[in-house]
Structures are given as structure tokens and as C-alpha cells.
């Protein structure tokens, strides 16, 4: 009878008490696990912050140019919150080291740019795939190649655009210091162009003494297109059709330029075959293109005539090359030297390069470390972008422009009066050339080049298409301090 009695609520209350008793350890365990996770996260972030600080003292392993935009502030998976880099397409990054498969450590090449975490190509590819999946789920037609849009482009055009998008990597490996290349006022190999560029070379050598390497390049760098160097079939075709520069020679020159740039010194190329910015647009050099511009065609004609009959015979081709350069959009060049006075042109170029120097050299925390490092170890983590860069011997001294009395005389030639007309400028250039610099490209007597074609043939065959509107430029002064 007692066993059959029922007390309402007894079993429920006892069961509830048991539940509450057994749930307390579970709740405490969840809190403890959460605290452990937070503690581990803080420890990982602290270690990442320490590695970030240590990277400030490490040399630049390699550099890349970006093909996409990225905002590190919005990336919650950054190892240290708020320490991700922000960059736009066509920016330049110095990579210090690899942190993980998803992250590198480096800095944006910009004055005042600090060390930060940089997403690796794998990380950016993962982000891109997530965005595509999200777009498909939301049914956004613009993200799906305009599927279902009546005004969608023809299949061939759409397929071409898709193919281009698929083959654009997030980063292109470039030299750690962008090489400086002079073009204009006309064709290299003729006296007027050679003497004007020689005066600038001499100025740069003395102005940036100890911080600059000026080297001559005879190989045809226009053959160093990424699509050619990475495609054995194209390499064979070009090697058969070009007697002047084999692809192997061009590849060797490219590697030498990369090697020069590793020292983080300014690199200036005296490139025999480069007369137009389009020739280097698709290479991995990412050069700083400097246009030495004569104010008017009449001034250039007068300069050419002053060099004698041997130069007058080639007046037409030189003027055609001048017209080709003048027709380029300003965005094709990083610097346009259109000053009438040589001193002003030199200072213009020097100020631009000083800004670039500060942008590429992160200020050291210790005092007295203003100069460039005397020796930089070899490239680190080369496998990160799948690039194989071989170590080379120390820089060849004979490849650099020698410091001689001629250079000193050239420097003195433009340190005179600051008030000069075009006529006086012409006389300065003529004297500098006559006394200091004999033409080295074998065109002053009208002789063809080694492959039987004059350089202007290659220049005039260039496309009128200029796909390098990504360069920094301002109409009056193309060296803004905030451009890096």
C-alpha cells in the first residue's frame, strides 16, 4: 500500500534536482574550455606579434607587385588583429619571411609603411573562392559572368575574359628595387639621345654615390615577357627569329638585374634596345620609366643638326621616334623630365628617387642605420611563389659605369648658371657629348644592328596599345610624396 502511494511532484523535483546537479560540472567545463581557448588564442597572437617585431630587423627576401586589392583590417583571421596590410592593385610589397601557409610578413612599399601580415597567394585564392560561392548562392548575375542577361557579351568575348581572369595570379614577383630606365628624347644609339642620357647618368652616379648601381644592358629586354619565358614553345620560335638576343641571354640579364636589386640600392639600366615604355610593359621588371622630353620638335631638330651630317642622315627616324614617345599618354611614364634647364631636370629626377628610396627602406629602430646594408643574404622562402632564383656571384664591377674624370667633368658641365635658354642648353648637351661620351651603340654612321635591322624598325612596329595606366603620375610634378 505504501509502495503504491503517489506523491505528486516528488519524482519531478528529484529528477530536476539531479539534472541541475549533473549540469553544473558541464557548465563549468564549458566555461573552462572557453577560457582555455581564449588563453591559447592570446598566446598565439602574442607569439605572432613577437615574430612581427623580429621581422623588422630581417632583410627583404623578395618583392611582389599586386594584381588585386585587399583590406587587412576587415580580415578577422589575421594572426594579429589590426596588423594586416592594406593594398590596391599595382602596389608593391616587400616580403620579409613566411609566417604560415596563409600569411607572409612584409610591408607595403610606401613612405612610413610598417611591418604587417600579408596574405599569401593561397589565402587570397581561398578568399576568392568563398566570394564566388557566396555570389552563386545569392544569385548575383554580375558575379556569375552575366548568366541569363540578354545583353551579355558574345560567347567568344566572355570566354576570353574568363580565360584572362583565370590566369591572373594575385602577385607577380618583381625586383626588390624597381630598375630605372631612361627613354627619349629619341632613339638610343644616336648622339643627341645618348649625350642627354649620359648627362643624367653622371648626375645620378654622383648624387647617389654609395646608394646606386648603374649598369649597361645590351640584351633585348623586350623579349623578357613573362608569357615567353614561361612558354618553351614561344621561346624556340623567338630564338629562331632573333639573332641579336637569345632567350637564354635575356633570362641571364633578368636574373642579374634581380641580383643587383637584392642589395636595395637604386638600380639604373642603360638599356641599349629600350626606346619605348611598351617594350617593358609585360616583363617582370616593373621598371620606373623616365621620359627625357625635349620641349618641342624644333629644339630636337636643331640639336640633331648641330651634330653634323652623319646625324642629319637619320633625322627622319629620330623625329618619328620622338613623335611616338610624345603620343604616349602621360600615365605611360613614372617621371617626365620636360624642364628646359639641365639642373632642374636633374633635381626633378633626384627628388623622385629620394622619395622612392625612403619608401623602400623601412626606418631601422636603432640610430645610425641610415645607409643601405652592405650585404644582403640570399632570397628566403623562394618556394612561396614557385619562383626559382639562382644565387649569383657578387656584382660584376666592370658592369657598372666607372667613376672617371669624364664623369666629374660631366657633373661640372651642369653646375654653372641657372638661367639658360634652349640655345644654351643645346650648347651644354653638345659640349658634354663631344668631350665625354662617344656613341657606343653603332648607329652614328648609319650601320645596321647585328640582326640586320635598325632599332627604329622594332620601335615603329610596336602596338599603339599602352596597357600601363597603373603608373603614378602628376602632370606638373610626377613625383608626389604620397605616391609610394
UniProtKB/Swiss-Prot annotation:
Residues 1-52, 129-170, 390-484 are annotated as: Disordered. Its main location: cytoplasm. The keyword Ion transport applies. Detected in the inner plexiform layer in the retina (at protein level). GO terms for cellular component: cytoplasm; L-type voltage-gated calcium channel complex; plasma membrane; voltage-gated calcium channel complex. Residues 409-420 have a biased composition (Polar residues). SUPFAM superfamilies: P-loop containing nucleoside triphosphate hydrolases, SH3-domain. One of its GO terms (molecular function) is calcium channel regulator activity. Keywords: Calcium, Calcium channel, Calcium transport, Cytoplasm, Ion channel, Ion transport, Phosphoprotein, SH3 domain, Transport, Voltage-gated channel. The modification Phosphoserine is found at residues 152, 393. InterPro entries: CAB1-4_N_A-dom, CACNB3_SH3, GK/Ca_channel_bsu, P-loop_NTPase, SH3-like_dom_sf, SH3_domain, VDCC_L_b3su, VDCC_L_bsu. Residues 195-345 are annotated as: Mediates interaction with the alpha subunit. Gene3D superfamilies: P-loop containing nucleotide triphosphate hydrolases, SH3 Domains. Transmembrane segments: none annotated. Belongs to the calcium channel beta subunit family. Regulatory subunit of the voltage-gated calcium channel that gives rise to L-type calcium currents. Increases CACNA1B peak calcium current and shifts the voltage dependencies of channel activation and inactivation. Increases CACNA1C peak calcium current and shifts the voltage dependencies of channel activation and inactivation. This is Voltage-dependent L-type calcium channel subunit beta-3. It comes from Mus musculus (Mouse).
